[in-house]
Amino acid sequence: MDRSNNIYQKVTDEIIEALQQGCPPWVRPWRDGEPVFPINAASGRAYHGINVPLLWRSADKNGYENDRWLTFHQAIEAGGNVRKGEKSSLAVLYLPQEKEVLDSNGAPVADKDGKPQVRHFALVREFRLFNVAQCEGLPAAFFEPIAQVDAPQETAEAIRRYSGVPVIHRRQQRAYYYPSRDIVVLPHPEQFDSQAHYYSTLLHELTHATGHASRLNREAITSGAAQFGNALYAAEELTAELGSAFLCAHAGIPGRLQHASYIASWLQILQEDNRAIFRASGQARNACDWLLKQTEQPQRLSA
């Protein structure tokens, strides 16, 4: 097994273990108003993609209440150290790459439109992180509460409003995205057991909507091939679950598992393909980036 494939398998095994325990690593009992993307304590930058569920999983597994992380050397550079005997957590450096396709003579290969064919791949490297709770002697600022989102509900409503996707409320028990009509259909807000449940469901369905041909053009949404019970359908649901979790974290809304019944199908696709969770988390991040970018445009126009 090559180095990259071994990392893919390590990550997949972590996610599978969590799912088998009935604890998807993207579902966390967050407090209202508290954004909890894991961040690097030294740089202040948030971790993205597959590192988000990996670090959420480690925090839950080990009881860490702080979402700040750093490397062994960063702890020393900050004037502290990692306590003896502490175990590190897995994280991944994932660098998308592209390269022109060449024929046997070294000449570029063109596609049907005459443009050079490009092969997409990624450089994947494992690195290890420690939670600040595993360290001593660090600056007090590393342990200060993370600033809360001022208005979680308004943040979620802005994502809905600027997405451009019509949201229709009906007195029913189902929530879904209707690709052919490009609409989201939800029960009325008062039918949900909490405001957080309503918004996490809304953000789940809006993540599906980003797959429309006019947006990110995801196969599961545009091809019609995703049918309940097949792998493409399960993969799209995994993308939407992660997308909802990431958006809830951004808005400071407690996350919630939308479809516990899908756990078995997620386990199946992960056991068959150790890159499936990387694709799903990458698609979820792209969906979140697209939705959040729409909320920024009106602000730029009014500035």
Report the location of each language-model feature.
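N-terminal accessory/interface modules of nucleic-acid-binding and processing proteins
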Residues: 1-303
